[in-house]
Regions:
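Phosphate/pyrophosphate-binding betaalpha-module
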Residues: 156-181, 185-189, 193-194
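Cell-wall glycan-active module
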Residues: 1-155, 171-177, 198-272
Length: 272
């Protein structure tokens, strides 16, 4: 009851302290107006008090805003240069990154075999993505997931695509999958494979058999990534280099051509 009263007061304060809601914004000063708009979507989606409170508490992520408001910061690696992309992304040489992928597969061979048997996505692809996203679980991100997701969805250039993920992030808070303060990527990515919240809701699976799908379980996250690729047309046993059907499927994971080429480049060199 006390939480309900506090939430009601907080929401009322939010409504009274800002002008009319805004569907999307291009100025940081209007972030409160966007939160009002999003609150309407959140309540319509049936998200409860914990999720609504997380929205009240969410601040604008400066890291996310700077990245989204400056498109030139999102470039810098020439097309068709996957080795350079791997080095820039991983902080080591492409050759060393590929060696680390092989080592990670060797240490988790049973897990990868089980996932490939079920979904048809090879270990080389999954372990490459895992390494690129979080250095195999070594760094899961430093931005509060809710703040990153809400900031990204507020920006007018991004909101049609990313607002559903912001709502999903608040639903994950409401369900207890993450907390209001759980940290991840600057776009609201979470867990070992840095799923966007809406994608986790859609494709997250229980890979380790403990009865729940957990993005912070490496096995669950890997199985869920395989499920996402297979659900979007991955063809087991087929090549995945540029020009193939499977290469096109990689775009559902990340729409950057540089990223897709880097996955294919590394995974092809990792081998079986």
């Amino acid at each position: 009851m006390r939480l309900a009263v506090c939430l009601s007061v907080a929401l009322s304060a939010l409504l009274l302290s800002t002008p009319a809601s805004a569907q999307c914004i291009t100025s940081k000063g209007a972030f409160g107006q966007y939160k009002q708009h999003l609150n309407q979507k959140v309540r319509a989606a049936g998200i409860g008090q914990r999720g609504q409170q997380a929205l009240v508490q969410a601040g604008l992520s400066g890291v996310t805003w700077r990245f989204e408001s400056n498109p030139s910061s999102q470039t810098g690696v020439s097309q068709g240069d996957p080795a350079r992309f791997l080095a820039k992304r991983s902080g080591t040489s492409a050759q060393n990154f590929i060696a680390q992928v092989r080592n990670r597969i060797a240490r988790n061979r049973g897990t990868f075999r089980s996932i490939e048997a079920r979904y048809g996505v090879p270990a080389s692809v999954l372990a490459t993505i895992w390494g690129l996203e979080t250095s195999w679980g070594g760094y899961l991100g430093g931005t509060p997931i809710v703040s990153g997701a809400v900031t990204l969805s507020s920006y007018c250039r991004r909101y049609p695509r990313f607002e559903p993920h912001a709502v999903a992030a608040l639903r994950l808070v409401d369900r207890g999958v993450i907390s209001a303060g759980t940290r991840g990527g600057p776009s609201g990515e979470l867990g070992h494979m840095q799923f966007l919240a809406g994608n986790w809701e859609r494709y997250g699976v229980d890979g380790d058999g403990n009865g729940r799908a957990d993005p912070y379980s490496a096995v669950d996250a890997l199985a869920s990534a395989a499920n996402m690729l297979r659900s979007n047309g991955w063809q087991p046993g087929q090549p995945f280099g540029p020009g193939t059907r499977n290469f096109q499927v990689l775009s559902v994971w990340n729409d950057s051509g540089n990223y897709q080429r880097a996955i294919a480049y590394a995974a092809e060199r990792v081998g079986g």
